[in-house]
Curated annotation (Swiss-Prot):
One of its GO terms (cellular component) is nucleus. Its cofactor is Mg(2+); Mn(2+). This is Ribonuclease 3-like protein 1. It is an enzyme of class 3 (hydrolase). Cleaves double-stranded RNA (dsRNA). Its EC number is 3.1.26.-. PROSITE patterns: RNASE_3_1 (PS00517), RNASE_3_2 (PS50142). Keywords: Endonuclease, Hydrolase, Magnesium, Manganese, Metal-binding, Nuclease, RNA-binding. Gene3D superfamilies: Ribonuclease III domain.
Length: 256
């Protein structure tokens, strides 16, 4: 007798679409889609290679991804601009990018259990990749981050795109949903108080940029690199070239 194959952890499929909608609305902090919005949400939760593609499903899903990507950037740009007047343009750019990065959004999808809600077809290798990443996110930090599958970030972006359309492009609703969905938010305060946890949210993506910002916010730090102490200021590492910024991933940082 052939042994039944069980879905990999984190890759189970939720066939009940009403249950899938309820799960998404919970992840969105109780946001409720309008009657027509249910169709938008189903497009967001249908993989671009699903057989429904012949009805234009692929194009609709990808258009929602595109819109959601831009909408998330707008949401976080306005949130940081409004909530922290002390942030300059560089700070705003780095914080926005960190909160909408592929790695950050992939972790959001895992924590909100969004992948099992995705309608997909013949995606066993992808399921395995998602399962492996899910275990790395939910387990203890190993020090060797696994890159988040792009499909996870795509789901988050498509859902946000659906919300933005369903809300009639309401920026206030968009900001609220983005903050609730993407917790924990990477902020200046959080980076200064718990930099390790916040940087782990990103894997390797944008990590160097944020390390530089942390040091700039602290004004001056001592950096030990091969026994040579150098000052770090808002202009970068010592008097060296911008290429030296890459060293920040492998040096030990000690606050002055």
């Amino acid at each position: 007798m052939q042994q039944q194959q069980h879905p990999a952890p984190g890759a189970e499929f939720v066939a009940d679409r009403d249950a899938a909608r309820a799960e998404v609305e919970r992840a969105l902090g109780g946001y409720s889609f309008r009657d027509g919005g249910a169709l938008l949400l189903e497009d967001a939760l249908t993989h671009s290679v699903h057989p429904r593609d012949e009805a234009g499903g692929r194009a609709r899903h990808q258009r929602l991804e595109f819109l959601g990507d831009a909408a998330l950037g707008l949401a976080f740009a306005t949130i940081f601009y409004r909530d922290d007047p002390g942030l300059d343009q560089g700070d705003l750019t780095v914080l926005r990018s960190a909160n909408v990065s592929t790695q950050k959004l992939a972790r959001v999808a895992v924590r909100r259990r969004l992948y099992p809600l995705l309608r997909r077809y013949n995606c066993a290798p992808q399921d395995h990749e998602v399962s492996r990443f899910t275990k790395s996110v939910e387990g203890p930090y190993s020090g060797d981050p696994i890159e988040g599958p792009r499909v996870l970030a795509d789901i988050v972006e498509a859902i946000v795109g659906a919300v933005y359309l369903d809300s009639k492009l309401d920026l206030e609703v968009l900001q609220k949903v983005a903050k609730l969905l993407c917790e924990p938010i990477i902020t200046k305060k959080a980076l200064l108080e718990d930099p390790e946890s916040m940087l782990n949210e990103l894997g390797g993506e944008h990590r160097e940029d944020l390390e530089i910002k942390i040091l700039a916010w602290r004004k001056v730090a001592n950096v030990v690199d091969d026994g040579r102490e150098q000052a770090i200021t808002t202009s970068g590492l010592g008097n060296g070239s911008e290429d030296e910024v890459g060293k920040l991933r492998t040096i030990r940082i000690e606050e002055a």
